[in-house]
Curated annotation (Swiss-Prot):
The record marks 338 as: Transition state stabilizer. This is Alpha-glucosidase. It catalyses: Hydrolysis of terminal, non-reducing (1->4)-linked alpha-D-glucose residues with release of alpha-D-glucose. The lineage of its organism: Eukaryota, Fungi, Dikarya, Ascomycota, Saccharomycotina. It comes from Candida albicans (Yeast). GO terms for molecular function: alpha-1,4-glucosidase activity; alpha-amylase activity; glucan 1,4-alpha-maltotriohydrolase activity; oligo-1,6-glucosidase activity; sucrose alpha-glucosidase activity.
């Protein structure tokens, strides 16, 4: 069995500050709002809070465009508020980790302002600048065909010095040049040591596989012939110096007992293990996207093909097994700030099955091996935004840019309206904004998130789905999560560290698996992921004792729609 560590046993609750809780009536969530709910967070059974970017920022990409690592976005609060949050978490036995956004900064960061000021500036080489390509007519073009994750070219021309800078994300997010040692040292001091010295317990490391770019900056292979700019992951992910950089960064954190989890994304098992093998001393663990990107093209989230339950099992198997038999560690998550809501994506958000399928997903997730991550609102079953919302309600730069590019490309086609409807269907299913609507605290106006109209529209179903109503209801999804997290905490060897065995893998309606650990009874979990009754046939021998289920009636012979059962078998 894997060596026990606090960060392996952590249950992490992710907070997206803008949409969590507004304390001062400006319509935007803030740090004092978070502090006011720490008792609620502790009551869930979580052990760690992950706070998404709260640094000073122009907010072009919701704080992933940092203008000052050593300060706080004014609408969220102050450095003093952060000190209070750190102390408030620690007083309740909670750890606090921050988002570490160091692949890029904002164009408003003082480093970039200096870098762009002249070709001779000492910080010029802290970012990635290249001269234009000039065609036979003397026209300027980007240095290569690399595409941005947020549509269009990954290069932006800067008139002042006549060169392009690289931005793998938005134009306002220039990539830092990790090849420059002075730049790296500044990152470590400003973004890492500053916060660890304040008492923060670690980091979720954003875009952790992107720091080392191949220095030839060649054109990327053409993956989408209908698009001028191409996905360029092969030249900026898992690059030649990436592990050198991570080892160097880990040395900076070594004096502190930190938890680090990397967002690396699409990697082979061999590539992934290099980041999180204990022997390599880089990161504790990483997020793999097998589950949350099911049915989508990882290079283009809105090219969607759908999936079935067997596909989901394959993704969970792949994600769970990658660390088995190694000294690495895995993570378990099904929602975050970049993904759609799990009930809408993997369950059934109709009024009839919403709560049942939410409990089914909860049981599945809370029984998986690895460090468990839960996203704000997931514990009450918040859903995707209604399909009836117009595109104007979406705030995310990723969606806005994609929709704009789509309209420019197809807007004059005779069948544009049909194409647009199909795109909006997919946007509604997968857009990041689904996770970014305000947390639904009560059935009061604005869902108890704020006393004024929030920065983003509250989901229309807040009167049916909210913390206040579920808190005192023993049969609610919220209290089902509490029961599951209590079980997970009491039986760590089984649920956190145990071995998962899939049973009847090809069944397209039932998800059945066992969890085993030395010295523990076998846990047998069976979940009906369909909207119809399915016959129940025990797949392992022994005496079955029902521990937890999401339905009131006791039917041993069949599972009703979205019924989930946990047995102990001896």
């Amino acid at each position: 069995m894997s060596e026990h560590k606090w960060w392996k046993e952590a249950v992490v609750y992710q907070i997206w500050p803008a949409s969590y809780k507004d304390s001062n009536g400006d319509g935007v969530g803030d740090i004092p709002g978070i502090i006011s709910t720490l008792d609620y967070i502790a009551s869930l059974g979580v052990t760690t809070v992950w706070l998404s970017p709260m640094y000073d920022s122009p907010q072009d990409d919701m704080g992933y465009d940092v203008s000052d690592y050593e300060n706080v976005y004014s609408k969220y609060g102050t450095l003093q508020d952060m000190d209070r949050l750190i102390a408030g978490c620690h007083d309740r036995g909670l750890k606090l980790i921050l988002d570490l956004v160091i692949n890029h900064t904002s164009v408003e960061h003082k480093w970039f302002k200096e870098s762009r000021s002249s070709k001779d500036n000492p910080k010029r080489d802290w970012y990635i600048w290249k001269p234009p390509r000039i065609d036979s007519n003397g026209n300027k073009h980007p240095p290569n065909n690399w595409g941005s994750y947020f549509s269009g070219s990954a290069w932006k021309y800067d008139e002042l010095t006549g060169e392009y800078y690289l931005h793998l994300f938005a134009e306002s997010q220039p990539d830092l040049n990790w090849e420059n040692k002075e730049c790296r040292e500044a990152i470590y001091n400003s973004a890492i040591k500053f916060w660890l010295d304040k008492g923060v317990d670690g980091f979720r490391i954003d875009t952790a596989g992107m720091y080392s770019k191949y220095q030839h900056f060649k054109d990327a292979p053409v993956a989408f012939p209908d698009t001028e700019f191409q996905p360029c992951e092969i030249y900026h992910k898992n690059g030649p110096r990436i592990h050198e950089f991570h080892k160097e960064m880990a040395k900076v954190m070594e004096p502190y007992d930190t938890m680090t989890v990397g967002e690396v994304g699409h990697s082979t098992r061999e590539q992934a293990l290099k980041y999180v093998s204990a022997a390599e001393k880089e990161m504790n663990m990483m997020f793999l996207f097998d589950v949350v990107e099911l049915g989508s093209d990882p290079r283009d989230r809105f090219r969607y093909n759908g999936f079935d339950l067997v596909d989901l099992k394959k993704a969970i198997k792949s994600q769970g097994e990658f660390a088995e038999g190694t000294d690495a560690w895995s993570t378990v998550f099904i929602e975050n700030h970049d993904q759609a809501r799990a009930i809408s994506r993997f369950g059934n958000d109709s009024p009839e099955f919403r709560v049942l399928s939410g409990k089914a997903i909860a049981m599945l997730q809370c029984c998986l091996t690895g460090t468990l991550f839960i996203y704000q609102g997931q514990e009450i079953g918040m859903t995707n935004v209604p399909r009836s919302w117009p595109i104007e309600e979406y705030k995310d730069i990723n969606t806005i840019n994609y929709y704009r590019a789509f309209k420019e490309k197809y807007g004059k086609d005779a069948d544009y309206k049909q194409k647009e409807e199909k795109l909006v269907d997919v946007i509604n299913r997968l857009a990041r904004d689904n996770a970014r609507t305000p947390v639904q605290w009560s059935h009061q106006q604005y869902a108890g998130f704020s006393e004024v109209e929030p920065w983003m529209r509250v989901n229309d179903n807040y009167k049916e789905i909210n913390v206040e109503d579920q808190d005192g209801d023993d049969h609610s999804l919220l209290n089902f999560y509490r029961k599951l997290l209590k079980l997970r905490g009491e039986y760590k060897d089984l649920f956190v560290y145990g071995e998962m065995k899939f049973l009847d893998f090809d069944d397209k309606k039932l998800f059945t698996f066992a969890k085993e650990a030395p010295g523990s009874p076998v846990a047998y979990i069976v979940i009906n992921f369909s909207g119809e009754d399915v016959k129940f046939e025990p797949l392992i021998k022994g005496n079955y004792k029902l521990v937890l289920t999401n339905v009131d009636k006791d039917s041993k012979d069949a599972l009703s729609p979205y019924e989930a059962r946990m047995y102990v078998v001896d």
